[in-house]
Amino acid sequence: MRTTRRQAFIARTRLAAAAVNATVDLHIAPDVVIGRDVRVTFDPRSRNVLQIGPQSRLEDRVLVQLKGGTIRIGDRVQIRRDCVLNVAGELTVEGDSPISWGSIIHCSTRIHLERMVGLAEQVTLADSSHFFTEPDAHFWHNVRTGSIEIGRNTWLCPKVTVTRDVKIGSHCIIGAGSVVVGEVPTGSLASGVPATFRPLPLPW
């Protein structure tokens, strides 16, 4: 009986965890589609969770980096080519979501995408940032974190960046190239650097 790509992915993932004395609670629905060169890496001795729900898809060259984190991907989620999920916290994608080519998610604490959230090409979500303290102290060692929440049926256009401590409501559109640094109310169109918002003329 031929080994499917999904079965090979599960075996490789378990071996990658064992190689660095990490653990992974792994649940991959039977009909999940795994592309070519999809990789999962683990921090040594970390404890991790990876769940992928029914009818979801990880396309070619997706990289998942688990650093003692939890990833819960619901049903009918498409993670397209060359995306990166770098997770030390808790990442939840509820379902019915496209995450398009080259998008990057850095999750240190908590990132939650409600159903039907869409990320276009090269979107970045990062719930942490670095800062300076003194001239000879490396900025990389100083980290601030804060969760990201994105509401139902919200669309992030290409090359949007969402920073820490951000809540975006439902039925929003975030314009291409925008940087979101604060709260965006439900039913808003937001754009710019930093993004400002105005009401979206919704048909209801």
Residue positions per predicted region:
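Extended, small-residue-rich solenoid/repeat segments and analogous flexible loops
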Residues: 1-65
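A residue-level signal for beta-strand positions that form part of recognition/binding surfaces
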Residues: 31, 147, 187
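Flexible, glycine/small-residue-enriched loop-and-beta-strand segment within the central core
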Residues: 38-166, 193-204
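C-terminal/domain-terminus segments
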Residues: 167-191, 195
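Short, solvent-exposed secondary-structure boundary motifs
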Residues: 15-19, 114, 169, 180-181
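A sequence-composition feature that detects small, non-aromatic residues
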Residues: 8-11, 16-22, 29, 88, ...
